[in-house]
């Protein structure tokens, strides 16, 4: 067990709660102490839902441990069924309750209810939230389809042609607390409808148990989020013969590949590559336009969940012309795919759930843009580097009221804006910092609003805080001291590489035995490392 200030994923019962909250007619009875009820805030505060998650907690206390906690569990199950009348019941336990070993799932199944009861065994001390969500969805689908006839050898994805109807597919994987899932579903539905493909079921988001039961009526499955739906898609393919897509439609290139893949699975004529000319997404042309030329070659560090990291690395490298200098994920289930992607870029993938290790990797790689989670946003802010959030965990500001997908053509437009705008703002800040001594930025001079006059002050405008980096007093005594002249020269260097320049200059000064770093030492160090 590890004590940490921040964590990328919660325990697996949070993942189960995400599935239950995403669906209709499903209730989750969670055997947990009172302290584990904090999870409600994730949905009401972060996701901003209008109702509480459909979860009943047993909320046992220390004094209950001396009695029969099994009866406490059965009492709460009985109350939940009588009050909420669910169509399907999930029963599980939190990390704390796992130690008691009451086996609430077995207790629920022995109570004689006619509704489907899904017992969840989620190892809290070895697995995390995304795995818990995937396992819950998998067990729910298996449990509800256990009486459906298996038809692996008989299924034909092209049977829609002989039945005189349009092909239909399932969209699997979107859930609450996923990154822009709600808007992604709408965008993918719009694209598929444009190509004559109907949606059979979207699950778990917005689905009811009755929808899950008819999930095998589709011709194929679309796995939108492998962290949540891949295990379910594999099971459906093995038992019902339903093929599923492997390409995630995030970015222009991936969306084209996705359309080709789903057309091939369904036996449809491949679509024309009309999207390449920018008629569907503006990302392609914008990334080639004159105003965006300065973006080419910018160093970018990417970290987040596996799905969005893999998509972001492809977009950054192939569609925007960025140089990927760091790639990693906290999703151990996706570690192999991320390692393979990093290897293609000549990098070693960072697989960790320690946000401090990620921050250290950002420092070492000295990127000009960070694409990460809410935690990387904080780290990048401390380091003075522009950042865009591409993955959960996220802040409430990353759940916008507007339509803001990541997938499809409109998703590519959103991604371009979200990634490029921080770079533009960063460039503006750097230019203001470089020219802050010019007369336009001096308070004593008249502004462009001549009739209003300037500010009368004898003090020079104070530079932004990130230009006033000083050597920390806690540094060892052998570290060289920066003179005011050296600090002034350092401030002229772009903020996104200033940390690396400072470190290299101090290293050079130590090598030559220099105790004070002035402007000349800085230039000598630059020449030394560029030689």
From Swiss-Prot:
It comes from the Bacteria. Substrate binds at residues 426-427. [4Fe-4S] cluster binds at residue 36. Its cofactor is [4Fe-4S] cluster. Gene3D superfamilies: 1.20.89.20, Nitrogenase molybdenum iron protein domain, Proto-chlorophyllide reductase 57 kD subunit B. Its EC number is 1.3.7.7. GO terms for biological process: light-independent chlorophyll biosynthetic process; photosynthesis, dark reaction. The keyword Transit peptide does not apply. It holds the Pfam family PCP_red. Belongs to the ChlB/BchB/BchZ family. Component of the dark-operative protochlorophyllide reductase (DPOR) that uses Mg-ATP and reduced ferredoxin to reduce ring D of protochlorophyllide (Pchlide) to form chlorophyllide a (Chlide). This reaction is light-independent. The NB-protein (ChlN-ChlB) is the catalytic component of the complex. Protochlorophyllide reductase is composed of three subunits; ChlL, ChlN and ChlB. Forms a heterotetramer of two ChlB and two ChlN subunits. This is Light-independent protochlorophyllide reductase subunit B. It comes from Prochlorococcus marinus (strain MIT 9211). The lineage of its organism: Bacteria, Bacillati, Cyanobacteriota, Cyanophyceae, Synechococcales. The gene is chlB.
